[in-house]
A protein has these predicted regions:
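A short helix->loop->beta-strand "cap" motif at the edges of active sites that frequently abuts
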Residues: 10, 31, 92-95, 122-123
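Active-site phosphate-binding strand-loop segment of PLP-dependent enzymes
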Residues: 39-112
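Hydrophobic residues in well-ordered beta-strands that form the structural core
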Residues: 14, 36, 97-99, 181
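Phosphate-binding glycine-rich loop
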Residues: 1-11
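Conserved core segment of the aminotransferase class I/II
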Residues: 118-199
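Conserved coil-to-alpha-helix start sites within the AMP-binding
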Residues: 18-23
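Short hydrophobic alpha-helical segments of the AMP-binding
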Residues: 25-30, 90
Length: 204
């Protein structure tokens, strides 16, 4: 749905390597090959902002830049200055930012991700979040979108409204996981559960 409701000519820059759902669905939407910027293993699997700028110049159809932070599949945690660089590129070119932050509470070795909400400023953007990776409930799935600065851009606002309207008419909502979220997230034991999981990952 995220890509299917974009303007048919609009494209999203996708990191490579990438979680295949993003690249394949964006390419399917555009009926073309994905527009990719590269994550360089020599740079700790981080992108080159200059490459992103060049791709934006070469492809005026680009409407957004996707970040996956922490990254899947590389595991890289983007430093604050890299997230800020992507937001700056988006702001300078009237784009919006998509941040897949599904793993944001599952990091280790002392590394913490910079969330899009911390640096987005007045640039339109959205963060994709959910419980499926961190919840102590195998098969429990529920995701949501945090939207920033919806009113700053008319086309972005229309796109967001379309996404939300489409979700309202879908069946099979994840009702049970939704009902548990307030209780689990407010439980004093939950942060310790996450810390223990991250510590176990660090030892492996």
């Amino acid at each position: 749905k995220l890509y299917g409701y974009l303007n048919r000519r609009a494209r999203v820059l996708i990191p490579s390597p990438s979680y295949s759902i993003h690249s394949t669905h964006e390419a399917f939407h555009a009926n073309s090959t994905p527009l990719l910027y590269h994550l360089d293993p020599a740079r700790g699997w981080l992108p080159d902002p200059d490459e992103i700028r060049a791709l934006v110049r070469e492809h005026p159809e680009v409407c957004a830049i996707l970040m996956i932070n922490p990254d899947n599949p590389t595991g890289a945690v983007w430093p604050r200055e890299m997230v800020e660089a992507v937001v700056e590129i988006a702001a300078q070119n009237d784009l919006f930012v998509i941040a897949d932050e599904i793993y944001n509470r599952l990091t280790y070795n002392g590394r913490k991700p910079t969330l899009l909400a911390e640096v987005i400023g007045e640039t339109p953007g959205m963060a994709l979040k959910g419980i499926s990776k961190e919840y102590p409930w195998p098969g429990g799935r529920c995701g949501w979108i945090e939207v920033y600065n919806e009113d700053r851009d008319r086309e972005f606002k229309r796109y967001i409204r379309t996404l939300f309207d489409a979700k309202m008419v879908e069946v099979c909502a994840t009702t049970q996981p939704q009902m548990t979220i307030p209780r689990v997230f407010s439980d004093s034991r939950y942060p310790h559960h996450l810390e223990a999981r991250c510590a176990a990952y660090e030892k492996r």
